[in-house]
């Protein structure tokens, strides 16, 4: 039996103009100046790359909204985005067509119609962040963009204690830009 997520990601059923589409994307943010497109800058952003690719599929402008903006160099593993389809198109066309116009460090994993009141940012139930610290004498060569390296010994007990304050549901609104 086929996985329903795969079936939906590649559904050939046409979705009418105006349908709100949600997508799961992933990206290596190393080469980008964050998520958000900058009006007066030619610096590459993930939003800019994604909108450009989807606009090539639709042959019309598209504005993409995300669950959470990331800073320069930050990666996204399961970022949910949405847009209102400016044309009749299938989920398969959004995924495969979008990916054909994206650079290799940005990918659309699935696309599906969602209710018109869905919003990637405000409908999110949770967000998860992962930080990887490698503590070794030698800096790793593989996956070096997805981690931070520390040569000197770390105090794991103190780090664990400090991290407890971050667990659970928190209000980090004071840290917003």
Roles of regions detected by a PLM:
Residues 2-177:
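Structured-RNA-binding interfaces characteristic of tRNA pseudouridine synthases
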